[in-house]
Curated annotation (Swiss-Prot):
UniProt name for this protein: Large ribosomal subunit protein uL22
Quaternary state and interactors: Part of the 50S ribosomal subunit.
GO terms classed as biological process: translation
Keywords for the protein's UniProt record, in alphabetical order: Ribonucleoprotein, Ribosomal protein, RNA-binding, rRNA-binding
Superkingdom, natural source: Bacteria
GO molecular function: rRNA binding; structural constituent of ribosome
Family of this protein: Belongs to the universal ribosomal protein uL22 family.
One GO term describing the cellular component: cytosolic large ribosomal subunit
Role: This protein binds specifically to 23S rRNA; its binding is stimulated by other ribosomal proteins, e.g. L4, L17, and L20. It is important during the early stages of 50S assembly. It makes multiple contacts with different domains of the 23S rRNA in the assembled 50S subunit and ribosome. The globular domain of the protein is located near the polypeptide exit tunnel on the outside of the subunit, while an extended beta-hairpin is found that lines the wall of the exit tunnel in the center of the 70S ribosome.
CDD domains: Ribosomal_L22 (cd00336)
Pfam families hit by this protein: Ribosomal_L22
Length: 128
């Protein structure tokens, strides 16, 4: 009486990694995600290595996890991996209060984000 096993949502030539609870706004995280979208995995890692954005280290860690998932769990060739998707979602928002003038208080929003990276193995083109 158990539920039927759920089919794999990704094709056989793809692997993914998800980073949750990243303490940065989704808008700022999306700036870094745009850098790696559609790039080869090795080039994307190099871009993140030398990026000056604070969140680039967490994005690099998530990309390395996706590459490791592709290699270890799905037996894909690391040299042929391309970042197929890199998308950002909203996380929770912590609300804090800061004192303002005349005994009032103002809200401060501290947003969190989620990052999903999907890598795909592409076949190397035959050079003519």
């Amino acid at each position: 009486m158990s539920k039927p096993k759920r089919e794999r949502s990704l094709p056989e030539n793809e692997a993914k990694a998800i980073a949750r609870m990243l303490r940065v706004s989704p808008q700022k995280l999306n700036l870094v995600a745009q850098l790696i979208r559609g790039r080869k995995a090795s080039a994307a890692l190099a871009d993140l290595q030398f990026s000056r954005k604070r969140i680039a280290g967490d994005v690099k860690k998530c990309l390395e996890s996706a590459i490791a998932n592709a290699e270890n769990n799905h037996d894909l060739d690391v040299d042929e991996l391309v970042v197929a998707q890199a998308f950002v979602g909203n996380g929770m928002v912590m609300k804090r209060f800061a004192p303002r003038g005349r005994g009032r208080s103002g809200r401060i929003y501290k947003p969190f984000s989620q990052l999903t990276i999907v890598v795909r193995q592409v076949e190397a083109e035959a050079s003519a």
